[in-house]
């Protein structure tokens, strides 16, 4: 068991300060009727509300790809909220780990480059 302060927080081993929440990057591939229905803008809006950083783009196969970085709890909430995007008909969401990527913000890209 690690040492905790009175607030139950565990100090960072490097600086002695309290550590920031763990960051994780995931890749989310969404298939179904997800292009030309406002899906990328919906995802950008959700990301903004949850302070998630990353990018979303259409893929040539008709799916939408999102790369998202945040703490794991917020990423889980983000994934569950994607299903509520209006006009989209989601057939499948495939989630995989992605190398940790630090984004300045969350952007909509036209296509994968």
Stretch-by-stretch model annotation:
Residues 2-113:
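Intrinsically disordered, low-complexity, mixed-charge
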